[in-house]
Amino acid sequence: MGSRPRSPSAFPAPWWGQQPGGPGPAKRLRLEEPAGPEPRVAPSLEDPAGTPAVGALTSIVVLAAGCALRVPLDDVDLVLELPPTSILRVSLDGHTLILIPEVLLSSVDERSGAQDDSSAGLEVDVFLGALREDVVVEQEVFCASVPEIAAQEEAYEEDADPEFPELQMDSAAGSAAGLYSSARSMFSPYREGPIPEPCALAPNPSSEGHSPGPFFDPEFRLLEPVPSSPLQPLPPSPRVGSPGPHAHPPLPKRPPCKARRRLFQE
């Protein structure tokens, strides 16, 4: 039988388009799309070495001998117990628990013999080993610093003990009395003879048992010329009323002037 020609349309389909037995592009796209999201594998206790999720929180718990860890969940309470020679790793929703017996921490040989979870055991050993080294170093530094400080303080006290009586004696004598007593033989360039010694101050009642020794040597002379110095002291100034070697002879008394005689008539 002959085929009837189709009526022309606004958008005629090309003759090389869809084949009668082949699928269309839309159906092919539907077949290539995944049927649905793949179900995620729920974490379980049977797979302790599984890779933890990104951003999961990891906690390390050290259990003493004969103790267990109780983890409260939504409906039940999970009780975790482990043998004293193994390390248990539990993965929950976004939280990873690593349980370590206390016996393994006390012996390096027992920690190295644990084969249940080698990766977790290495991480825990490195972490706890570094922490233990820090604690030991702090204790050694603290214990060593205490005797050194005590020995230094004792040495300071022994060195300072002989100096304390001298300081007390000097302070009891009084700085003013010591300075005044050292000026008993001081000479002045403007007067002849030494300066008279000033009166001594009243003794301090607290210094009766100490000897008020002067601070300076009483034989010390101030303002004495130095032999090697070109500067020499000035000669003493002449006293008023005493004729010097270069004194001028007294002038004769003159009669008062005429104006003075008129003003002051005798």
Curated annotation (Swiss-Prot):
Pfam families (UniProt xref): DUF2476
Compositional bias of kind Pro residues: 227-238
Family: Belongs to the PRR23 family.
Taxonomy of the source species: Eukaryota, Metazoa, Chordata, Craniata, Vertebrata
PANTHER family for this protein: PROLINE-RICH PROTEIN 23A (PTHR31813:SF4), PROLINE-RICH PROTEIN 23B (PTHR31813)
Biased composition (Low complexity): 1-18
Protein name: Proline-rich protein 23A
Biased composition range(s): Basic residues: 255-266
Span list, region Disordered: 1-47, 197-266
Domain of life: Eukaryota
InterPro entries: PRR23
